[in-house]
Amino acid sequence: MTFPMWFAVPPEVPSAWLSTGMGPGPLLAAARAWHALAAQYTEIATELASVLAAVQASSWQGPSADRFVVAHQPFRYWLTHAATVATAAAAAHETAAAGYTSALGGMPTLAELAANHAMHGALVTTNFFGVNTIPIALNEADYLRMWIQAATVMSHYQAVAHESVAATPSTPPAPQIVTSAASSAASSSFPDPTKLILQLLKDFLELLRYLAVELLPGPLGDLIAQVLDWFISFVSGPVFTFLAYLVLDPLIYFGPFAPLTSPVLLPAGLTGLAGLGAVSGPAGPMVERVHSDGPSRQSWPAATGVTLVGTNPAALVTTPAPAPTTSAAPTAPSTPGSSAAQGLYAVGGPDGEGFNPIAKTTALAGVTTDAAAPAAKLPGDQAQSSASKATRLRRRLRQHRFEFLADDGRLTMPNTPEMADVAAGNRGLDALGFAGTIPKSAPGSATGLTHLGGGFADVLSQPMLPHTWDGSD
């Protein structure tokens, strides 16, 4: 309240304020506390200075000792400054207490004011025919004097209190004693977001209070400052802090996951998992198969004929055997008691590539079918005898055979044009049937290596040459 405002207040109001208040006792107690704090600051600063001097004079020498002394020097200066501030605050409280005492002494008392009112009432009551006009005027003038005196005293007391508060310096925060590396390591941890928000809110309110005091002098600025002080104290209180943590913590920690709880936005959050459909599982083991079908081309010239011996001498027939189209294993002339002798196989394939030992039933069935094909054309007993001998041969065979390699995706065989298996003989037409044909005398192409078809441990012997090549060339 400024000086003109105190003249609008009756003297009874400020007199009652000063007379019924706490008096100068709390201000003097605060001044004594500030003096004690200043003495403690001074004592600690003196002790720290003696410790630093002892460190420099002791056996601890070197860069670490120098860093210790240098790190504590700002703190010692701060202790000295804090002692000065505490002394100034104590003096300010003493000045405010003195101003209060002076204001209380210069303020018209409530008894004087009450006596003036009583005198004025008596004079007015006994004022017959205007005999008390002058005493009443004097009484009113005295009351006006007390009014002006109360306003003047309160204005002076307000000025003294304001100057005392403004003259009190503020204490800065204590400097850090640890090194910058330790400070950065200590501050590297992520702060509490709710605490940070509360601190920002208090800083904003304090900024508003500072602007209100500086830009709005007078009653309006004081009113806004008091309201902001109440808000700052409420924000700093435990109730608002509890409510802030209760509201802000779920929003901070669980707010980013809120779209996942919505049935409308959940498909949009799971669209990133759609690419997992293109990821295939581990591939299964590769199963190697051995095809029973041989290559489509002829790998070795067919035998010129097969001699079949039966139980009936009249049924003995010598005919040239047609070259098989699917098997490259020709049959040799048979002897009594056996359908055919085991011949040579033309085995083709890439260098260094072995044959899979799991070629069991499929390869065996192909060879048996090719061996039994000519016997199927024989009449009667020869066909049965050949079939039974082929069966016995199949039983005696082992579970490993040399067979043609098929295209399994790892090897691509060169394609060669197919050639006719038989051609017309040069002797003319003798008898109808297979007797008038002979194997084609055209040279065959070398497609592999010759190999004996007997033992499992046989190795490749010599390269296969066309039958028209002379060994002397």
Curated annotation (Swiss-Prot):
Parts of the chain that traverse the membrane: 227-247, 250-270
Domain of life: Bacteria
Protein topology in the membrane: Multi-pass membrane protein
Xref: InterPro entries: PPE-PPW_C, PPE_dom, PPE_sf
Gene Ontology annotations of biological process type: response to host immune response; response to host iron concentration
Record's keyword annotation contains Methyltransferase: no
Family from the record: Belongs to the mycobacterial PPE family.
Protein name: PPE family protein PPE37
Organism: Mycobacterium tuberculosis (strain ATCC 25618 / H37Rv)
Phylogenetic placement of the source organism: Bacteria, Bacillati, Actinomycetota, Actinomycetes, Mycobacteriales
